Curated annotation (Swiss-Prot):
Required cofactor(s): Mg(2+)
EC number: 6.1.1.20
Catalytic activity: tRNA(Phe) + L-phenylalanine + ATP = L-phenylalanyl-tRNA(Phe) + AMP + diphosphate + H(+)
Annotated cofactor note: Binds 2 magnesium ions per tetramer.
Record-level GO cellular component terms: cytoplasm
GO annotation (BP), single: phenylalanyl-tRNA aminoacylation
Residues where Mg(2+) binds: 264
Entry's Gene Ontology molecular function annotations: ATP binding; magnesium ion binding; phenylalanine-tRNA ligase activity; tRNA binding
Signal peptide: none
Similarity comment text for this entry: Belongs to the class-II aminoacyl-tRNA synthetase family. Phe-tRNA synthetase alpha subunit type 1 subfamily.
Protein name: Phenylalanine--tRNA ligase alpha subunit
Subunit structure: Tetramer of two alpha and two beta subunits.
């Protein structure tokens, strides 16, 4: 047996006898460290003659590979044994209580959207949706809003820059972030045969920001298209909706003449409130004051015509209100900006249980 064979046997023996990782590391440093015996042999190859290097080189490299592989195998065996020992000594007490998991809550806007869908579903309305990036035709022109209307101004509407090489105005005009959910009504009238009953909740965008306005807000609009529709149907629908939403039968509505380009006649709708300890409470047969909550009216014949329907055959009414404002009135929030701040304290206070699904039988705000 040569000296290299003896060295190999000695190192393999030390490796196999290592009882822990620290001892194995000592063997590795002794053999393969910078000053290790195997490392010294590898360095000596540079001083040998070509004949000696050809003879002893393969043997020395084989020695190094055997030692390195032995160390790796022994390390894995020691780590496995250590893990098994740890698992055997550690037990799980299944009777201990589990860590408390934080619970999320439903945002008030989501809750109100669910309440609106439940109320109007009971009245035969479907929920419709549409793109938030719209063109001028669907957002303005089809709704009888002329080019000169201030709503089309840059300071009130978020317009997109035209793509490179594209015309500033295509067939449908410039692209923009919708300023209301009315384009959903247009798309529904274009793509669906009447009669139509829909609500269109969703995000809308206007260049405005203060305690009661944000650049992005939520709106719901309703549309009915049928034969023989008149203002009495609109008034009954609004009264039924408001009383169901605020869960009070003593709510009084006041309809005031107004102007909207897309309805004729148009009306602002106020809800009566009573004062209790300085607070405004929605409801009461003898209101102490009035608060505006939504706009409404009979769909303008020009809008019906723009959607390919005959206004002499089909009539309709529409209404719209801010979902965020409805939430503020019902649940007592004071600042609209808090809806979008992401303050966990605010969300915990005003949030709703995720499984608390609104129903008319159980009370939509229960």
């Amino acid at each position: 047996m040569t000296d290299l064979d003896n060295l190999k046997a000695d190192l393999i023996g030390q490796i196999s006898q290592s009882g822990d990782l620290a001892g194995l590391e000592s063997v590795r440093v002794h053999a393969l460290g910078k000053q290790g015996v195997v490392t010294a042999l590898l360095k000596s190859l540079g001083k040998m003659t070509p004949e000696e290097r050809q003879e002893k080189g393969p043997v020395i490299h084989s020695l190094r590979q055997a030692v390195a592989q032995g160390i790796a195998d022994r390390k894995q065996a020691l780590e496995t044994a250590l893990l098994n020992e740890k698992l055997a000594s550690e037990t799980i007490d299944l009777s201990l209580p589990s860590p408390k998991m934080p619970k999320g809550s439903l945002h008030p806007v989501s809750q109100v959207m669910d309440e609106l869908a439940e109320i109007f579903a009971d009245l035969g309305f479907a929920v419709a949706s549409g793109p938030e990036i719209e063109d001028e035709w669907h957002n303005f022109s089809a709704l009888n809003i002329p080019e000169s209307h201030p709503a089309r101004a840059m300071h009130d509407t978020f317009y997109f820059e035209p793509q490179e090489g594209a015309s500033d105005k295509g067939d449908k005009g410039r692209m923009l972030l919708r300023t209301h959910t009315s384009p959903v009504q247009i798309r529904t009238m274009q793509g669906q045969e009447p009669p139509i009953r829909i609500i269109a909740p969703g995000r809308t965008y206007r260049s405005d920001s203060d305690a009661t306005h944000t650049p992005m807000f939520h709106q719901v609009e309703g549309l009915v298209i049928d034969k023989g529709v008149h203002l009495g149907h609109l008034k009954w629908t609004l009264e039924t909706f408001v009383r169901a939403y605020f869960e009070r039968d003593d709510i009084v509505l006041r309809l005031r003449p107004s102007y909207f380009p897309f309805t004729e006649p148009s009306m602002e709708v106020d809800v009566g409130y009573t004062l209790e300890k300085g607070r405004r409470i929605i409801g009461g047969k003898q209101p102490d004051g009035w608060m505006e909550i939504l706009g409404s009216g009979m769909v303008h014949p020009n809008v019906i015509t723009a959607c390919g329907l005959d206004p002499n055959v089909w009539q309709g009414f529409a209404f719209g209100c801010g979902i965020d404002r409805l939430a503020m009135l019902k649940y007592g929030m004071d600042d609209l900006r808090a809806f979008f701040d992401g303050d966990l304290r605010w969300l915990r206070h005003f949030g709703f249980a995720a499984l608390d699904v609104p129903t008319l039988s159980g009370g939509v705000g229960a």
